[in-house]
Amino acid sequence: MSPLALSTCWNSHRHHDGYDMLQEIRQLGFPSVELGHGIRYSLWPGILKAWETDLIKIQSLHNFCPVPTGVVRPNPNAYEFSDPRPEVRRLAVRASEETIRQAAKLGARGVVFHLGSAGPEISDKLESLYEKGRYLSRAYTDAKVEAVRKRKENFEYIWPRVKECLDPLVALAGELKVRLGFEIREVFEEFPHEEEFPAVLDAFPPEVVGYWHDFGHAARKEFLGWHSHLETLRLRSPRLLGCHIHDCRRPSDDHLPLSHGEVDFAALLPFVPKDAIATLELSPRTPEEQVIASRHLWNSYVADSA
């Protein structure tokens, strides 16, 4: 498996120099990095210096990277391919093109994509019911059934909108030899949901587009009864490009260091291809020693599964 990378989502917020940001990650023992969606343009000169001097390998970028001009607060959903406004979709495509071009320049293997939203808003309600001990109550199941019904209606107009945006981006990525990973999202209302993934992935060539698994996101959905984490990973394994690694406590406390949650990595790891990109994506609040401990734990899981 690819050497474990650390996402800059852990430390980009506290750095003004991109070289120093990447040097901090390298000094923690990580040979590679994912440039997260919080990378400001001011960090870019230092990032290029680190890349040119072989300080660290850049495995992947998370769209949008760098943060688009005009976006005040870094947000991977600042512009969405699903937005009903054509001008916003154009901004999403333009910012994504920039990410793909930068990934190609840096020799990154892939770019992580969020594809948008399709509603309905249901996750906060389900998590609230869960925390009140009403998981699988009548109110809980009725809310889920109605959400699924509405989502099937929404898919019919959301998916063509998203695909229209993705078509030129997939073409550009193919031309530049960069792969795109469509990420499993943490809430039902984001697109695509697990049942929608086959149609989305099948629309694009596997040599360009893959699936991006996120262990914490998949756990959150499993806790709310949307899917089986193991079964989803098993089904998507043939198209799996990479994964975000973090632990999660039910129902929604994710981006935790490994062993601080309930994700059974040992059971899931056999379904992760040996050549997959592996990225530790931890909360900025994670202490340095827990970042290092998570790296050691992941490497031990990989060794045990070999």
Segments predicted by a language model, with ranges:
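Residue-level detector of anion-binding/catalytic polar loops
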Residues: 31-32, 57, 109, 179, ...
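Glycine-rich, proline-tolerant flexible connector loops at the mouths of alpha/beta enzymes
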Residues: 35-55, 115-122
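Histidine-acidic metal/acid-base catalytic patches
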Residues: 2-26, 41, 46, 52-54, ...
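Short acidic, glycine/proline-enriched helix-loop-strand junctions
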Residues: 43-62, 128-141
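Short catalytic-loop micro-motif centered on adjacent basic/acidic residues
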Residues: 31-37, 181-183, 279-281
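Active-site acidic/histidine proton-transfer and metal-coordination neighborhood
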Residues: 81-211
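N-terminal substrate-binding region of glycoside hydrolase catalytic domains
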Residues: 24-43, 73, 78
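N-terminal small/glycine-rich loop or linker at the start of catalytic domains
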Residues: 1-9, 64-81, 119, 139-149
